[in-house]
Amino acid sequence: MSATLKDYLNKRVVIIKVDGECLIASLNGFDKNTNLFITNVFNRISKEFICKAQLLRGSEIALVGLIDAENDDSLAPIDEKKVPMLKDTKNKIENEHVIWEKVYESKTK
């Protein structure tokens, strides 16, 4: 069975963002663009409390997963040396502004 975000409402979730950041939070709302309203947000690796409430754009999200309430060790200590850093999934183009300048010039001629 495939889960939908509505199955995760008002539950603890793990969120992996496209920049590789991993968050633990409670999912309180979402929309058709996968924008998420989350509360009690923690960084998964450093255990640092980030904020009480946050709105994440759907374009920033790579994965949302449910945390098992019975075995919730999401904020248990982690040996950071053993955790591989997640690769950034953003599409980055070097000197992208130069490309867009050429596109603009070609359309204005």
Swiss-Prot record:
InterPro entries: Lsm8, LSM_dom_sf, PTHR15588, Sm, Sm_dom_euk/arc. It comes from the Eukaryota. CDD domains: LSm8. Transmembrane segments: none annotated. One of its GO terms (cellular component) is U6 snRNP. The keyword Cytoplasm applies. Belongs to the snRNP Sm proteins family. PANTHER family: LSM1, U6 SNRNA-ASSOCIATED SM-LIKE PROTEIN LSM8. Present with 1440 molecules/cell in log phase SD medium. Component of the heptameric LSM2-LSM8 complex that forms a seven-membered ring structure with a donut shape; an RNA strand can pass through the hole in the center of the ring structure. The LSm subunits are arranged in the order LSM8, LSM2, LSM3, LSM6, LSM5, LSM7 and LSM4. Component of the spliceosome U4/U6-U5 tri-snRNP complex composed of the U4, U6 and U5 snRNAs and at least PRP3, PRP4, PRP6, PRP8, PRP18, PRP31, PRP38, SNU13, SNU23, SNU66, SNU114, SPP381, SMB1, SMD1, SMD2, SMD3, SMX2, SMX3, LSM2, LSM3, LSM4, LSM5, LSM6, LSM7, LSM8, BRR2 and DIB1. This is LSM2-LSM8 complex subunit LSM8. It comes from Saccharomyces cerevisiae (strain ATCC 204508 / S288c). The lineage of its organism: Eukaryota, Fungi, Dikarya, Ascomycota, Saccharomycotina.
